[in-house]
């Protein structure tokens, strides 16, 4: 497949309003691709270059992209930036700039889908002091051979933000339709492999094998997620439940085979070198080959410390030993996904818990059975007294469903409801906040698109505001007056008093009295609130269901 064909598919998808029509279009393309092209196309059309579990990262920021395009077009970086500010879209701006170049130059080489992928692999492999120079050289070569339409989607792909509405759910359904398979079978394989590109290839080569796909050590899967809910509703719906403390820590996944172990964050990053104490504790705690799910909790004098202490340990590459002395982390393991060559994800929680107790023992988080709301609320009160966030209320026969935010697991916390939202823009401040960002535009995800739900300015101290400016200043993609568009990479936890319907935002909803709680450095965009889950929260709110 030529990259131009891929760009044309994306252009058609971008102009298609209906979800089913989009699925039809992608499903029609998939069978025409060869075995090498198929997984690459599937990832690309979702705006991704590598599988979620892969440690490969492009490492391309807006400035590198601006420099590459400026070089190819024969202009200055500021001209590229101005074009992006005018259009509000990196892809459209690059397309326009390349259209001017096209009138005065000849193409050197046709871009092929696989050639683009191999060049992006080369970009990701660049390391050391000269890595940025090598990445720039690769980007210049790609844009130098790109037609304007190709440039639109190449620019977005480099920033891994395609904006055409093909999220995982749509692509999963397209794979099922293309190869005439039950979508549940495709979803099962996707949960285990964590790569729809590989799933698509397997669906064509050996569809019968999809049902037998299992998770593998050292290939992290997405973590099962919880919805906000109530103790009373969970017990009313399911009878006996398992109640666990909700820790103010950071999720991790521990993989072990023999004497080799790795730890992955909830963003699926390898953080083993940052957490040698956690690795050693769990390595010594079991002789079995396992994949465990748990939470790293900071403690001082036996009492839990806030999340901010935990995150200072994650992804730290320097002075790890000195930071270990300052901040003690303990693992609280609450689930087991894999044991001695066998996946346990499809087994009920009660069985998984029994296996966990048998193979680990130490460092297992306490779990309490409850059959009535009074007993569960007593555990909830105890959790708060101990300094924890609240409780998790889990259905005992629930399977482990990677990446799914469902009601089989419910989180219960006191006070204001919170949402994890993607920061997609900001507005320059005034008065005391002049010279920095004063408010931030927040969005929910919906099948590859990010839809705004409001702005937050309240709850941000001057000190935090300075930290946020440092965090975002190099993530600015476009400017328009006082407003800027940001790379959608950072997640805010935001409190609110009410969800309202609103014509002012593309999502159709707005938050009443939004308040900044914290940056969720441990969370990826894929783990943020979806439009569907926001609508469900709105429905529960209208029905008068609270958070306790």
Swiss-Prot record:
KW Magnesium (keyword) present: yes
Cofactor: Mg(2+)
Catalytic activity line of the entry: ATP + (deoxyribonucleotide)n-3'-hydroxyl + 5'-phospho-(deoxyribonucleotide)m = (deoxyribonucleotide)n+m + AMP + diphosphate
The protein's role, per its UniProt record: DNA ligase that seals nicks in double-stranded DNA during DNA replication, DNA recombination and DNA repair.
Keywords: ATP-binding, Cell cycle, Cell division, DNA damage, DNA recombination, DNA repair, DNA replication, Ligase, Magnesium, Metal-binding, Nucleotide-binding
Active site feature: 246 (n6-amp-lysine intermediate)
PROSITE patterns in UniProt: DNA_LIGASE_A2 (PS00333), DNA_LIGASE_A3 (PS50160)
UniProt-listed HAMAP family: DNA_ligase (MF_00407)
Family of the protein in this entry: Belongs to the ATP-dependent DNA ligase family.
EC number(s) given by UniProt: 6.5.1.1
Species of provenance: Methanoculleus marisnigri (strain ATCC 35101 / DSM 1498 / JR1)
Name by which UniProt lists this protein: DNA ligase
InterPro entries given in the database record: ATP-dep_DNA_ligase (IPR050191), DNA_ligae_ATP-dep_bac/arc (IPR022865), DNA_ligase_ATP-dep (IPR000977), DNA_ligase_ATP-dep_C (IPR012309), DNA_ligase_ATP-dep_cent (IPR012310), DNA_ligase_ATP-dep_CS (IPR016059), DNA_ligase_ATP-dep_N (IPR012308), DNA_ligase_N_sf (IPR036599)
Binding residues annotated for ATP, in chain numbering: 244, 251, 266, 295, 334, 405, 411
Gene Ontology biological-process annotations: cell division; DNA biosynthetic process; DNA recombination; DNA repair; lagging strand elongation
Gene Ontology MF term list: ATP binding; DNA binding; DNA ligase (ATP) activity; metal ion binding
